[in-house]
């Protein structure tokens, strides 16, 4: 395992042959190392990776994990996972050998995450802590399932955090109408919030909409994509889940509003985004509108909860609502169970009648 000096650059490089997973011999060259030791260490880790040798460092295995998983996930999903890996997991585990990571190491890492406070003294939320642990566990589980690691130290150590989500807030119809009236001074904001409230779509789905997504003759809105801003780029991805691809019937008043809005956009093209604003813009507008209307501030996503709440109040079933908002019906039943009217009284009355008839 030799390393070579690059006399022109004053650095070291590794150059060697290896067999890839198909048994084909290939040459590998990597430049820019400060010392011979660094070059040799990199070559050693690379060869351990190729052999899937579990004495490789955790950092080396993460590169294998990235190769295996990245192409299988939506770009925005991977971006979130990668940020967690690079900033919250690798700084602690990168130098440890994969096979030597113990539950006590995971517990020590968990304690660091639990003790973290930002400059304002704020800790990580329970749901974020659970997400961090879940990502570490996913990496180690990948090693167990596909590369022969004996056990998942993160699973043995146990989880941290919880699945308790932020309080679900929503506006009543009356609150939304007050807000909407304030928004009328900015047509783009007004129509964006009209779609969010009356159709219950996600923020990314809204920002991806183009004229081609509307069939105004039939009052239909097709949800087939989502917008994300990733690393300074506008990215159009598939919707969140396969169930999210759907066609929504719009109420007639909203169909008329969208027809007017599309006519007002100068030379809009069929595939051009009709809301070329950022998520932060919508959040700012939500702040402004809630304050001026005198209604409580809710999150953009809570407009989706508000739509579901309205449909439940109108008497629609969980299945019908799920089809409209792109959820599984069991998710609607679970998340919004407290909003559905109780059938217990009706059940008791009918059972009473059955007993009397007997």
Regions found by a protein language model. Name each.
Residues 123-126, 130, 145, 149-209, ...:
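Basic, Lys/Arg- and aromatic-enriched nucleic-acid-binding interface segment
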Residues 170, 227, 280, 318, ...:
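Catalytic-site neighborhood detector that most strongly recognizes the C-terminal catalytic loop/helix
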Residues 218, 231-233, 237-245, 249-254, ...:
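C-terminal secondary-structure termini that scaffold catalytic or DNA-interacting sites
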Residues 127, 145, 194, 198, ...:
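C-terminal catalytic core of tyrosine-transesterase DNA break-rejoin enzymes
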Residues 3, 67-153, 165, 187, ...:
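N-terminal core-binding DNA-recognition domain of tyrosine site-specific recombinases/integrases
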Residues 178-182, 232-238, 338-358:
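DNA/chromatin major-groove-contacting recognition/catalytic segments
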